[in-house]
Amino acid sequence: MKIKAKNIVKIYDQKLPSELKALDKVTTEINQGEFIAIIGQTGSGKTTFIQHMNALLLPDQGEIEYLYFDSKNQEKKLVVQKPRFFRKKLKFINEIRRRVGVVFQFAEYQLFEQTIEKDIIFGAVSMGTPKNEAKKIAAEIIELVGLDQSFLQKSPFELSGGQKRRVAIAGILAMDPDIIFFDEPTAGLDPQGTLKMLEILDTLYKKGKTIILATHDLDSVLEWTKRCIFFKDGRIIYDGDTYSILANNKFLIENKMLPTNLLNFREKLIKIGYPISNVRSVSELISEINMLIQKETNAD
């Protein structure tokens, strides 16, 4: 599946000044097989954007185009605009939500007060999967998100915050969407929990899912993604290579997105193939990355 957002505008309160938009002429594309980071501070528009991609919200202006192949392998196109009538909305909303999944930051609100197995089975059955087959899917998916079979018989109130997020991911995976958005999946997790969560996302990506990770933490995305979409005040102010942002010291400082752990950050860059020397400050690190990017540009 491919998603094209074209000049999306969202205004929650029409009485507010016109410049106070939750989304302001947002235009971007999400292609099949990408692992993208959506970066921005709290209130920048990240979550509102995600809610539009999943049809939880509809744009006040602009349109969202979905390109996908149906069960007969025929290419389909679905264009979403603000509908005039509710009946028109029903024609596309189920198809979008079947193909575009969302795991929100507060995952416990996506879980029912029943066993984890029933939670996961519900997602599969809602997409037309027979119940017996859905039970087998639940057993496979629970291990995919790093939990053993014993968790299937537990209830949500028995789980930690990180475990609840994994179960929420399992419920979405049971619906087998093409694209999955994760809204602040590492928020509130300890370093070990953060690493495990990112490893789960990377595993899903390698299995062919399109993954979009929304976060305000620059450190947690550099090892895993190469493209990022940077939101500020409801607008996209950058959409491109993650590391190219680091070539602009002023941009990072103005948007308060400097890496918090310089040593850890340097090690991540080396791990993915950037030969960074022993730098002593963020400014030195940025300067060295700038030279590497320039060298790669000249080579091309």
From Swiss-Prot:
Disulfide bonds: none annotated. Gene3D superfamilies: P-loop containing nucleotide triphosphate hydrolases (3.40.50.300). It comes from the Bacteria. PROSITE patterns: ABC_TRANSPORTER_1 (PS00211), ABC_TRANSPORTER_2 (PS50893), CBIO (PS51246). One of its GO terms (cellular component) is ATP-binding cassette (ABC) transporter complex. Keywords: ATP-binding, Cell membrane, Membrane, Nucleotide-binding, Translocase, Transport. Pfam families: ABC_tran (PF00005). Its EC number is 7.-.-.-. Residues 3-258 form the ABC transporter domain. One of its GO terms (molecular function) is ATPase-coupled transmembrane transporter activity. It is a peripheral membrane protein. ATP binds at G40, Q41, T42, G43, S44, G45, K46, T47. Its main location: membrane. It is an enzyme of class 7 (translocase). Coiled coil: none annotated. It is found in: Cell membrane. InterPro entries: AAA+_ATPase, ABC_transporter-like_ATP-bd, ABC_transporter-like_CS, ABC_transpr_CbiO/EcfA_su, ECF_ABC_transporter_ATP-bd, P-loop_NTPase. Transmembrane segments: none annotated. Belongs to the ABC transporter superfamily. Energy-coupling factor EcfA family. Forms a stable energy-coupling factor (ECF) transporter complex composed of 2 membrane-embedded substrate-binding proteins (S component), 2 ATP-binding proteins (A component) and 2 transmembrane proteins (T component). ATP-binding (A) component of a common energy-coupling factor (ECF) ABC-transporter complex. Unlike classic ABC transporters this ECF transporter provides the energy necessary to transport a number of different substrates. This is Energy-coupling factor transporter ATP-binding protein EcfA2.
